[in-house]
């Protein structure tokens, strides 16, 4: 499904650059609901990876920009690659929730 040789049509920012943007962006946490409940970055909305990949049109609008986060940045990078190929404006959060140094919401 994904090739390491394909061009990335999305950008990435570090989890450490996210603080000033919280509350001003659409932040989507694509981890499973049990992971999200264990703790998530403030303002993040949970839409599991499988759901967003199977039916992006149910959750996303192609005229808006979304920041995608997971635990480490790997799932979010794969998701961004797919969604950008479908015409969605997405930004990967590298480092993910696991690298977030401030308190997580529960």
What residues fall within each predicted segment?
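Rhodanese-like catalytic fold shared by cysteine-dependent sulfurtransferases
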Residues: 1-16, 21-25, 33-65, 71-106
